[in-house]
Each structure stands twice: as C-alpha cells, then as structure tokens.
Amino acid sequence: FTVYAIKGGNLMIGFLIMASIWVALGMIGGVSTWEDAQVKVFQGGPESWGSTAVIVIFGSWFGQVLIKTGVASTLIRKTVELGGDKPLITTILLCLVTGLIFTSTFGAGAVVAIGVIILPILLSLGVPKPLAVSSYLMSVGSGMYVNIVLFKQMQGLFEGFKYDNNYLKFGFAAMAVQLLVVFIMIGVRLKKTNVNHSWAATAGKVSSDEQAPWYALITPLIPVVLAIVFKWQPIPAFIVASFYALFVTGKIKSFKECEKIITKTFYDGVVDVASLLGFLFILPMFNKVS
C-alpha cells in the first residue's frame, strides 16, 4: 500500500481495497464474521463520519457564498489598495488576508477561485511562480490551524480533543509561525528582484459589480468569532455568516432570487468536496478493520 501511495495511487480506492483484504483475512483466520464486518466496518465506518461530513459541506457552501457575493475578491482588492506602491507590504498583506479568509472558508473551489485572483497579483509583484504558489498555499494552510471544519475532521480520528482555548492557543500560534515563514520567504526573494508595478492593472480586474460594501468584509471572521467567543456550533455559525453576506451584498432581492443563489452555492459547495467526502467515508472502514 505504501508503494502504491508513493506512486500516486488513488488513496480512496487503496484504503477500500486494504479494508476489504483485511476483512477477508480476519474472516479466514476466524477473528471476525461477515456479519461483524458489515455492521462495524462497511456500515459503521462511514456512519461514524456523518456529522463531520455535514460540517464539511456547510463549510464549503460558506466558501462559495464568499466567492459569489464578491466578498473575497473585494477584500483582496482593498488589501492591494492598502499596500499602495510598496510591493513587499502588499504581498505580506495578501498572504495575511488569505490566512484570515481560510480560518473559516473550506473547499477546493474556494482555494482555486481566490487563487485565480491572488496569484496573478503576486506574479506581477515580482514573486517567482514557484514561490508565489508556495506562499499562497502556505497562507491557505496557516488558516487551517483554526479552521473548525478541518478540526472536526481531525476530531473524527483523534477523539477527546476539543475546539477550546487550549487548542486555539496552539492554533493561532502555529498560524502566526507559518505566516512568518511565508513573510520571510517573500521578503528575502523580493529584495533580489526588480519589482514592476503592473500589479495595479491586475488588481483592477475586480469589477465594480463584484465589489461588496465595507461592512461585508467582516464575513470571513463571523463563523470564527461565533465559535470561539459565543461557543456556537459550526453549522449555525456558517448559516448566519452566509445569510449575512447574501443580505448585505444585495444578493437577496426577492424570495426566488434567494432560492436560486442558495441552491447554486450549496450545489457548488457539495461538488467541491465530493471527492473529499468519498475519502472520508472510505477511510473509517480502514480504521475500523485495522
């Protein structure tokens, strides 16, 4: 299995095959029966991740709402404007904002959609392609230390851990360290590069139709604040934050329009994490039988 994984094999299929082989070996050795395998492995495994899967879906939906309402693109544009004509400061601010966005946002679609905006700006600031991609992904990863959606996934593997102040002290400290590494990487590289200022034109690609009002820019922080300060559960926090973004950006002008955008963003959110959900349902089969 290790060789299969190193060669780039599909881990979801690999875990399913391994779980099936181990079940067969257990039955041959008389350790378990087919009835036990059905209930505890093939049925009980995926069911044990049901609550986590739902949180993943709502987190991905929230990410789609941030994109469709223009909150993410506007936040990035304002960050570039704040940096002014200082490329290093602009780059650092972009990485910081990316980390903050992904403290609550989840889903591959959100990573791609926001990356499409940020990466061209980083490249125009003189950041080499490998460093631009690495810096962006590390900034995304820094936010994941306190992202409750990812925490719930890990909680399924390591039971007993709580999303409380003890964990958050570590989470925010780890986030700060990772962002600091990104800042150092970029700072050292930009000092060796002749920077051009074509980033202004790149930043201008965010059209006025996509701009969200300033009070909508707090949306990425709402789920985090509700979870940490007010001890809310993640799903209600995502729902409140999503409707706040839809309302203040004027996306809810009628009931039909509300139905349309919620259905569309929810659909896109589920599609974004479909392969992840498949993996999350197969993995516990392997865990149970092992």
Predicted regions and their residues:
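Residues that define the loop-to-transmembrane-helix transition and helix capping
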Residues: 12, 88, 130, 164-165, ...
